């Protein structure tokens, strides 16, 4: 596993973004882990978050793209900090764009989008925190493709939970890839998280001990993707 991925896993734990215990998800599933990207709240955290996304995007998709698109709401700050980090790390100027939940009907920037306008020929990388159902892409992809003749290069999320979507045996990322025809990737997978944190001390404690590891294993026996 690359060094930046190991650092990112520990960064999520240190930032209180990735937690282990017992959580009820929106789907109703009882999960032994939970990720909340809304816990990134400081300037230094957001700066580092952008750098991790930029590294993963550069490694996966290169720099042949024009726009980073972050769906509202959590995708907005992620797309902004990643655009800054991409320029700082790779000297590449990319634009950011996001959609609005409610269309703005006044001012110079009225409409359904904020940030850069999408143009014919743009190559777009989508950014999200985590995708469990694919619902946000269901809403966003038609918007993006409907406003201009763009190419969606791929999607990058923080964490691939590696579990079945609500509609079948495939993960949300697999379903998105098959439905919309672009690549889907994550900075890290849950398998990599467990591999790195199991019986490892982080912030003075073992984050994934035998009990939590057993709970994760049981969860994936029921909900894991092949």
Protein language model regions, located:
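PRPP-associated nucleotide enzymes
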Residues: 1-127, 132-226
């Amino acid at each position: 596993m690359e060094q930046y991925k190991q650092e990112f896993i520990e960064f999520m734990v240190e930032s209180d973004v990735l937690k282990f215990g017992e959580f009820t998800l929106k789907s109703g599933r009882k999960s032994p882990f939970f990720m909340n990207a809304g816990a990134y709240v400081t300037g230094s955290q957001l700066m580092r978050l952008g750098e991790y996304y930029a590294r993963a995007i550069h490694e996966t998709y290169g720099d042949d793209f024009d726009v980073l698109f972050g769906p509202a709401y959590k995708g907005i700050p992620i797309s902004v900090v990643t655009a800054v980090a991409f320029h700082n790390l790779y000297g590449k100027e990319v634009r950011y764009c996001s959609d609005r939940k409610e269309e703005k009907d006044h001012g110079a920037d009225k409409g359904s989008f904020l940030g850069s306008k999408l143009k014919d020929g743009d190559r777009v990388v989508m950014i999200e925190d985590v995708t469990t159902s694919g619902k946000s892409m269901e809403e966003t992809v038609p918007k993006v493709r409907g406003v201009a003749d763009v190419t969606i290069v791929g999607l990058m999320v923080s964490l691939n939970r590696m579990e079945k979507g609500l509609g079948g045996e495939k993960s949300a990322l697999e379903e998105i890839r098959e439905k919309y025809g672009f690549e889907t990737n994550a900075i890290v997978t849950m398998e990599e998280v467990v591999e790195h944190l199991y019986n490892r001390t982080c912030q003075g404690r073992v984050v994934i001990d035998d009990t939590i590891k057993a709970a994760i294993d049981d969860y994936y026996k029921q909900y894991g993707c092949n």
